[in-house]
Regions:
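Structural motif
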Residues: 36-37, 140, 163-164
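Short, acidic/polar
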Residues: 18-29, 148-155
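Short polar catalytic/cofactor-binding loops
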Residues: 8-13
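Cys-nucleophile CN-hydrolase/nitrilase-fold catalytic domain and related Cys-dependent amidase chemistry
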Residues: 16, 24-103, 172-192
Length: 252
């Protein structure tokens, strides 16, 4: 059986310590439901806070992230968390990163390839056209928010052999309809499964829509959060059939 989930989390602006603790609570809750891969939203560990990003850059070995790396090992669950990271070139603005903490203790980094208009004022873009890793036993391509608005990004994921297109996002109420139709289209037209984790509350001035979701290959939406709030959006496949459920996140 395969079991993956989007963590629809709520970030405390700029408070990495507090956000690590809330992430840990969601990881432990996901473990109780047999989740093998848990994906958090864009910049989940800091909130979407452009003016704070330069002071919140984190590397995989920073002590504040150690509890998450240990949780990945102890639960046997791969985690994808969002955080500002060092740029590729010294002196550049920080990149918008997704740290992957594997069940084997390894860490890997994906930098957001396509910036949203205006993000160039505080962030630098990555250069990887595709980043595919074996997570929960499945070739998984990572995406961060605006990456998903570029069809060539999803196509590159398919061409690289991805089974799952996993994206951490900041999607507002106003943008949700367009973005979700595009994600559904990738599942329908490219035959990949698509998992999207959105913030469950406002962040960085955006009234996030929540409604994190999963689409199976072919485009059927298996499960989606009904709205905002912290929750786990879980999709599982057994004997070729997908099922979904939404689990309320533990109180902090």
């Amino acid at each position: 059986m395969l079991c993956i989930a989007a963590a629809q989390s709520i970030s405390v602006p700029g408070d990495v310590q507090a956000n690590v603790q809330s992430h840990l609570s969601m990881v432990l809750a996901a473990a109780r439901h047999g989740v093998q891969l848990l994906v958090f939203p864009e910049l989940s560990l800091t909130g979407y806070e452009p003016t704070l990003a330069a002071g919140l850059v984190l590397g995989a070995d920073d002590a504040v992230l150690a509890p998450l790396r240990e949780a990945a090992r102890s639960t046997g669950m791969a985690l994808v968390v969002g955080v500002p990271v060092a740029p590729l070139a010294a002196g550049d603005k920080p990149a918008i990163g997704a740290w992957v903490f594997g069940a084997d203790g390894a860490a890997a980094l994906y930098r957001k390839r396509y910036l949203h208009p205006g993000e160039e004022q505080f962030a630098s873009a990555g250069v990887e056209d595709v980043h595919v890793r074996l997570l929960a036993g499945q070739p998984t391509a990572l995406a961060v928010c605006a990456d998903t608005t570029h069809p060539e990004h999803a196509r590159a994921a398919l061409d690289a052999g991805a089974f799952l297109y996993a994206c951490g996002s900041v999607i507002s109420e106003g943008g949700y309809a367009k973005d979700s139709v595009q994600l559904k289209g990738y599942a329908a037209d490219l035959g990949m499964s698509v998992l999207m984790a959105n913030h469950g509350a406002p962040t960085g001035g955006y009234a996030c829509a929540g409604r994190s979701a999963f689409w199976a290959p072919g485009g059927a939406q298996v499960v989606a959060a009904p709205g905002v709030g912290a929750c786990l959006v879980i999709a599982s496949r057994e004997d070729g059939a997908w099922q979904g459920r939404v689990v309320e996140a533990p109180a902090q």
